A protein has these predicted regions:
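Catalytic domains of carbohydrate-active enzymes that cleave complex glycans
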Residues: 330-331, 339, 343-409, 493-582
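Substrate-binding cleft of secreted/luminal carbohydrate-active enzymes
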Residues: 461-507
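Aromatic-lined carbohydrate-binding surfaces of glycoside hydrolases
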Residues: 145, 166, 174-175, 186-193, ...
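Active-site clefts of carbohydrate-active enzymes
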Residues: 437-466
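Bacterial Sec-dependent N-terminal signal peptides
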Residues: 1-22
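Mature N-terminal, pre-catalytic/accessory segment of carbohydrate-active enzymes
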Residues: 19-273, 372, 565-582
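Aromatic- and acid-rich polysaccharide-binding/catalytic face
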Residues: 401-427
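Short, glycine/acidic-rich beta->alpha junctions
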Residues: 77, 244-247, 296-300, 385-386, ...
Length: 582
């Protein structure tokens, strides 16, 4: 047993790298020089409500001609809703801070404890490929324009110093308790700097007499792949130690609070080779004993799954991957006391024997834990022959194993896949979606570096992230997948660029459990998906065909082929007004 414990530690070892572990940090220098001429007409600090649709440029005055001192929002009970204020100043401001009051409606109150403020901070980004058609492929940062962009929502830093001739956004999020009384609530956001009040902004919130269920009960199937190894590297802690889990808890809670449904588990060494800055290691120890039999240790896998379930992510476990990018499988060979690799591909006897041993043992373990029914053996898109051969092995190991695929549309795989996710440009037929839904199967879509928009790069329009969930509603799909929640780059708080794909492609949350404009807007879209679902169910029960027709007409705006005619920003804002009327 001691040898096995040592082996587990060995498999979890990681190269110690310097990481910025302090929760207070300096932003990267702005690669774009400030143009004094743009600031010539700004003679004093300006404060206004802005728009969550805009990433305000640090080096330019906010494009607001008349300061807006009052903001009107509408929400359901149980909803989280956000607004953005903006400060731009010709002179330096010290100790800039935002303070919120309670929101009141007669004797009813939404406590300020349910309101979070944060600075919208800046990170380096880049751009699409030069042809503008996507963002895939390895890239040299020198070949792309780099700028600072507003994305990080920093709720940790209490005050900031704002240099002269610069702009700073502030993000205000209100979590409306489910037991809140319907009505119009009012409160204030006070902006202070240098010990004095610069402005008081009024916040008006209309709470409708409708209730959104908690995120754990949302129907929307959100699958953002988690990378625990990035967290251990960044903070220089032992993977899956108590310290590691303590650091991950608030990070992964962001995912749970967004309605995350799927736990990402790596059951073999580097399922995606080395495509991320921090490679995924195996959460399962593979040991070939001296007598030729196999031993599998699930200690790390179990810890990880239990940790995520405790946060409320418990609908599905996706295990990657029997068909990795590189068909080479690592295990520890006791006879030689060394790591070895088996090079084999689906359809070969060696491949089948290798995976049969593991899957049969894994099946027993999952059943003992009570997790078998929610566990999926997960794959990325691979050649059809490889996927079909892999399915044969899975079914031979245990005919009841569930299988998921994020890839392209293959009609011949519809019945075999319990969770099927295809590209945004491909379409399931309405009949296929309904047949799968009645069978309890999940049907979703994904975006990646291929799509110029809609997307969630750090330079993408904020509304694009929200548009994604509306599109799921329009297509009658169950949800959305994006491959990376937190596969951080070297210095994620300063520079979101990576050696492959556009900036921000690899992560949506930041160290310190800082959210992003992208995640907040994606979550708002998911909330509206739930609103649409709830309203349509109600109207179908009541026979309100007119309301259903109106909602379906509204959803037609969320077509990826018509974004040049109706931008994501326009579509989202129009649709929200329609839904919030009910």
């Amino acid at each position: 047993m001691k040898k096995l414990l040592f082996l587990g530690a060995l498999l979890l070892s990681t190269v110690c790298m310097n990481a910025q572990t302090s929760e207070y940090y300096q932003e990267a220098a702005n690669p774009i020089a400030t143009n004094p001429a743009l600031w010539a007409k700004v003679t004093a600090p300006q404060i206004s409500w802005g728009s969550t649709d805009i990433r305000y440029k640090k080096e330019e005055p906010a494009p607001i001609h008349s300061a807006q001192k009052s903001m009107n929002l509408t929400a359901w009970k149980g909803e989280k809703i956000s607004a953005q204020l903006v400060v731009w100043t010709p002179k330096a401001l010290n100790d800039l801070t935002f303070m919120v009051s309670d929101l009141t409606s007669g004797s009813a109150t939404i406590s300020k404890e349910n309101i979070r403020t944060g600075f919208v901070r800046y990170v380096i980004t880049d751009e699409l490929n030069k042809d503008g058609l996507g963002a895939c492929g390895y890239r040299n940062s020198a070949d792309f324009d780099s700028t600072l962009v507003a994305d990080v929502i920093d709720h940790i830093t209490p005050t900031l110093t704002l240099p002269a001739n610069s702009t700073q956004g502030g993000w205000i999020s209100v979590n409306i308790p489910q037991g809140t009384k319907a009505g119009k609530y009012t409160g204030t956001v006070t902006v202070k700097a240098d010990g004095i009040t610069l402005s008081e902004l009024k916040l008006n919130l209309q709470v409708k007499n409708r209730t959104l269920p908690p995120p754990s009960e949302w129907a929307f199937h959100l699958d953002l792949w988690q990378n625990p190894y990035a967290v251990s590297r960044y903070y220089n802690v032992e993977p899956f130690s108590k310290k590691h889990f303590d650091l991950m808890r608030p990070l992964m809670k962001l995912y749970a609070d967004a309605g995350g449904k799927v736990i990402t588990a790596s059951i073999m060494h580097k399922p995606w080779n080395g495509q991320t800055y921090d490679a995924f290691e195996s959460m399962v120890t593979w040991l070939k004993k001296a007598d030729g039999t196999w031993y599998f240790d699930y200690t790390v896998f179990d810890k990880w799954v239990e940790f995520m379930m405790d946060l409320g992510v418990k609908k599905q476990i996706s295990c990657y991957s029997m068909v990795p990018w590189r068909l080479s499988f690592q295990y520890f060979d006791q006879a030689s006391n060394s790591f070895k690799f088996l090079d084999a591909k689906p359809g070969e006897v060696a491949y089948e024997e290798f995976w049969m041993n593991m899957l049969q043992d894994f099946s027993k373990h999952l059943k003992a834990k009570g997790w078998f029914d929610i566990t999926h053996i997960a794959m990325d898109e691979r050649p059809m022959k490889d996927m079909q051969e892999t399915l044969k092995v899975i079914r031979k190991a245990d005919k009841d194993f569930k299988v998921s695929l994020a890839g392209t549309y293959h009609k011949e795989l519809l019945d075999d896949l319990n969770d099927y996710c295809i590209t945004i440009v491909e379409k399931f037929t309405p009949e296929e979606i309904e047949v799968r839904r009645k069978a309890g199967k999940v049907t979703t879509y994904y975006t990646c570096c291929t799509e110029p928009r809609p997307n969630t790069f750090t330079f993408s329009e904020p509304a694009e992230a929200e548009w994604l969930a509306w599109h799921s509603a329009k297509e009658n799909l169950d949800g959305y997948l994006r491959w990376a929640l937190n596969s951080w780059v070297k210095n994620p708080l300063q520079d979101s660029r990576f050696t492959a794909w556009a900036a921000g492609d690899t992560y949506m949350i930041y160290p310190g459990a800082r959210s992003s404009i992208r995640l907040e807007r994606l979550t708002e879209g998911i909330q509206f998906f739930e609103k649409v679902r709830i309203l349509k169910e109600e109207f179908e029960e009541k026979g309100n065909k007119g309301a259903i027709k109106n909602i379906n007409k509204t959803l037609k705006m969320f077509d990826e082929s018509s974004m040049d005619k109706i931008s994501p920003t326009t579509a989202v804002n129009k649709a929200k007004k329609v839904i919030n009327r009910y």
